[in-house]
């Protein structure tokens, strides 16, 4: 944050190097046989929308365009403002991951036909089994008007008991 204001040219040069290296790495992943790519932008929410549009969106486009036609591509931008989600959906990705701050009803209305993934707060997996089941079922019941991939709204926390992750998986698989 702030790098682009003071060192705009250098910030763009840095992003260019990052995207070039990442693109090369992801192409190797495809060559080695991955079935899907998922890009996590865990710091997306730290930038104001105008800076995200300047310093991130053009580079995401450069990264996604040559790959999304070859392999399914999921983009997850944690903390992204709702005003930017429709722009992300137009980058050519096959699905958008949502964190727990995005309202599922709003997302389905704003992004018709877009496959959505998420958005259970990972901290719920630290709760009791009853809470995990309840929160997971609630999440699943809210994603009814779109193609959907059940998942957490960010990465699993290191201290999450394996048994609790299994409860989440079992709840998703048994939901109807």
Model feature map: region roles:
Residues 1, 30-55:
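Active-site-proximal loop/short-helix segments
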Residues 2-7:
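Short, small-residue-biased leader/transition segments that mark boundaries at the very start
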Residues 8-18, 45-50:
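Surface-exposed cleft-lining segments at the edges of enzyme active sites
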Residues 9, 19-37, 57, 61, ...:
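Alpha/beta enzyme core
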Residues 11-24, 127-134:
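Glycine-rich anion/phosphate-binding loops
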Residues 52-59, 131-135:
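Charged helix-capping and loop-helix junction motifs
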Residues 68-176:
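Catalytic-face loop-and-helix region of soluble metabolic enzyme cores
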């Amino acid at each position: 944050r702030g790098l682009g204001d003071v060192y705009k040219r250098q910030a763009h040069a840095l992003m260019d190097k990052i995207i070039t290296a990442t693109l090369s790495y992801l192409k190797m992943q495809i060559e080695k046989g991955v079935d899907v790519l998922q890009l996590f932008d865990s710091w997306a929410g730290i930038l104001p929308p105008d800076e995200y549009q300047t310093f991130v969106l053009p580079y995401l486009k450069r990264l996604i365009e040559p790959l999304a036609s070859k392999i399914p591509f999921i983009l997850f931008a944690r903390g992204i403002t709702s005003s930017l989600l429709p722009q992300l959906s137009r980058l050519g990705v096959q699905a958008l991951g949502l964190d727990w701050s995005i309202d599922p009803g709003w997302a389905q209305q704003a992004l018709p036909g877009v496959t959505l993934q998420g958005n259970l707060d990972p901290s719920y997996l630290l709760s009791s089994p009853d809470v995990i089941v309840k929160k997971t079922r609630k999440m699943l019941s809210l994603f009814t008007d779109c193609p959907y991939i059940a998942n957490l709204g960010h990465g699993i926390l290191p201290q999450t008991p394996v048994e609790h992750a299994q409860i989440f998986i079992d709840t998703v698989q048994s939901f109807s």
